[in-house]
């Protein structure tokens, strides 16, 4: 299973007698899937309904998205951030101060994927800074998103080549 590999139109019947159609997708080179091994695709390809997780963060706290990315709450009022990622992806909260050292020490061991062996080929994380003024999703392309509910300054880190964008919250 590799995201974006539907080869032909697939007709999916719905209960009311209508249909939806799954069509071949577009390969987007700025998605996480292109930086993972086949065995690690399970962390970004949900097989069950995603269970959002809400984290109450104080300013200057960080959420690691396993070893695949990082979300820094730089400043703002304490608030809940809701993470929408595959249920298998482990998120880890820590203080912003020392977060880079924490990543260097634990990427590939506590923060997996990627494993320590895969980390040698994994692109470095790149920082993207955003000032949020309304309910907004911070999207890690091909991985998931974090909903920011109130005004905040945040930094989102993703592997070089993976897009991080913001959009008006969809949920």
Predicted feature locations:
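Helix-rich effector regions associated with P-loop NTPase G domains
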Residues: 1-171
């Amino acid at each position: 299973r590799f995201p974006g590999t539907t080869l032909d139109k697939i007709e999916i019947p719905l209960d009311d007698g209508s249909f939806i159609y799954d069509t071949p997708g577009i390969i987007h080179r700025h998605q996480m899937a292109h930086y993972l091994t086949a065995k690690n695709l399970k962390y970004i390809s949900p097989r069950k309904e995603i269970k959002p997780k809400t984290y109450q963060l104080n300013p200057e706290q960080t959420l690691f998205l396993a070893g695949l990315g990082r979300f820094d709450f730089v400043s703002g009022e304490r608030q809940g951030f809701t993470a929408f990622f595959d249920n298998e992806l482990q998120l880890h909260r820590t203080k912003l101060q020392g977060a880079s050292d924490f990543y260097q020490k634990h990427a590939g061991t506590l923060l997996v994927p990627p494993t320590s062996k895969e980390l040698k080929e994994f692109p470095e994380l790149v920082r993207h800074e955003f000032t949020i003024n309304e309910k907004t999703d911070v999207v890690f392309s091909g991985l998931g998103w974090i909903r920011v509910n109130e005004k905040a300054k945040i930094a989102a880190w993703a592997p070089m080549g993976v897009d991080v964008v913001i959009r008006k919250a969809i949920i």
